[in-house]
């Protein structure tokens, strides 16, 4: 039998700990999930008062307007290649109709499941349940972008993918401990389902490679190998970006969207996860090299993975908020969009690993727990105050979307399609194949009035016999 991973060999005051058994485990899990639910309800109280973004209405409407799941797959799978999310969304539309609270509850439940699987995976990486629970607490209170809960389509993509992302890690950990074809099949199946939710899940393959090569055949951590792989992956991703942006003929934007995530979106999560395990207590973990590499990896994340308009802001955010152990996302929720949902879990894992290593180095376990408690409380308070403050700025247009929903739903007639114009110049490769089939209504395609790309479009509809006009401007449909 191959040796256990190095993270499972860690022992001592701040190392491994046996998991709680029986009723205690259920009690701890229940208390933790209840606390997380209470926090989400408090922190996102302002967002819950609004409806969905216009894109979410688009996907919701398609699922509501058509009885056959086959239509959902055949119609917009061409531009939105995530069949597992289609299936989730179609089922959710049937179960939840258009009631926002039901989607919020489903999103919170999916997020809680992600945290639970994350804790299970972190137990082997961090060498014990207490530190894994600490990492889960940080992820639960600090790294839940409001978009992930608020956007019923885009958020579901991240949440559903996250479930199978962490499941793949767990199955692979078990496969390493006891190899066998059955366990390998579980790894492959979970990876396939993660890919069916989001194509960037293929970046789990570098995770498995880094995991294997970092520990080596004897199961001992080899951090220099990990740093070499990090440098190689970074160089490979930069080379791919250069190719897609400057060399690839044709449609570089489409290529970047489809291929870029395969190479880089989540490998930073993978690498940071491995590095957390590559530095167990007593191995000289807290070194300038580790902290420098940590910062460099996240600088690369902001430079190469975030939208262009946010890159400069992201680098400034790193420089300004660099503080001991809590230099991320404290006052700036918008700096962590849904695209960094999985990397955020890797960051939470790195925090727990650093606190664990610090406590071991100083031989003061309580200090690590105290710092962890301060970090969790500070991040929870900061987000709980900041998110409602951001809501009027970011979500106010969403309130006007509710007017459009009310108008369209008043005209909802099963079997009679309502065509809603979507600005094809924004992302023609994604939206042109489907051209936005919306709800089930009483209008014909001639009732759609396209305008310029800057102004978007106008939709003429009827509410109880009265004409009403919806305009698409700055990303939102508004009633006029």
Question: Model-found features: residue ranges?
Answer:
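Polytopic membrane enzymes that build or remodel cell-surface glycoconjugates and lipids
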Residues: 2-480
């Amino acid at each position: 039998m191959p040796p256990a991973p190095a993270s499972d060999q860690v022992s001592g005051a701040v190392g491994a700990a046996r998991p709680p058994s029986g009723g205690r485990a259920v009690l701890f899990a229940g208390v933790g999930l209840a606390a997380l639910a209470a926090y989400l309800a408090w922190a996102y109280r302002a967002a819950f008062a609004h409806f969905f973004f216009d894109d979410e209405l688009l996907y919701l409407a398609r699922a509501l307007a058509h009885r056959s799941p086959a239509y959902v797959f055949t119609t917009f799978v061409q531009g939105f290649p995530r069949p597992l999310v289609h299936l989730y969304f179609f089922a959710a539309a049937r179960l939840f109709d258009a009631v926002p609270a039901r989607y919020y509850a489903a999103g919170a439940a999916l997020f809680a499941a992600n945290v639970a699987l994350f804790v299970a995976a972190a137990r082997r990486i961090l060498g014990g349940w207490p530190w894994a629970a600490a990492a889960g607490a940080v992820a639960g209170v600090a790294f839940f972008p409001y978009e992930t809960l608020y956007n019923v389509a885009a958020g579901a993509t991240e949440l559903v993918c996250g479930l199978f992302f962490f499941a793949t890690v767990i199955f692979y950990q078990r496969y390493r401990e006891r190899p066998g074809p059955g366990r390998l099949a579980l790894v492959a199946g979970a990876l396939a389902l993660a890919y069916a939710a989001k194509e960037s899940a293929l970046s789990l393959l570098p995770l498995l490679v880094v995991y294997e090569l970092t520990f080596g055949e004897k199961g001992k951590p080899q951090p220099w190998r990990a740093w070499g792989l990090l440098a190689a992956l970074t160089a490979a991703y930069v080379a791919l970006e250069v190719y897609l942006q400057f060399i690839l003929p044709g449609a570089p934007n489409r290529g970047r969207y489809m291929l870029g995530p395969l190479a880089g979106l989540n490998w930073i999560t993978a690498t940071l996860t491995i590095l957390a395990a590559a530095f167990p207590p007593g191995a000289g973990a807290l070194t300038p090299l580790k902290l420098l590499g940590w910062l460099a990896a996240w600088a690369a994340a902001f430079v190469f993975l975030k939208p262009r308009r946010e890159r400069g802001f992201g680098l400034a955010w790193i420089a300004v908020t660099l503080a001991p152990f809590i230099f991320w996302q404290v006052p700036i929720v918008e700096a962590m969009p849904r695209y960094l949902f999985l990397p955020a879990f890797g960051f939470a894992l790195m925090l727990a690993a650093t606190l664990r290593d610090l406590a071991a180095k100083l031989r003061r376990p309580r200090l690590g727990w105290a710092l962890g408690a301060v970090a969790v409380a500070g991040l929870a308070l900061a987000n709980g105050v900041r998110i409602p403050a951001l809501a009027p700025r970011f979500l106010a247009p969403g309130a006007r979307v509710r007017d459009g929903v009310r108008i369209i739903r008043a005209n909802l007639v099963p079997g009679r399609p309502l065509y809603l114009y979507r600005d094809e110049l924004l992302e023609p490769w994604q939206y042109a194949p489907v051209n936005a089939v919306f709800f089930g209504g009483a209008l014909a395609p001639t009732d759609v009035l396209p305008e310029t790309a800057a102004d978007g479009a106008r939709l003429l509809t009827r509410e109880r016999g009265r004409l009403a006009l919806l305009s698409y401007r700055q990303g939102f449909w508004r009633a006029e």
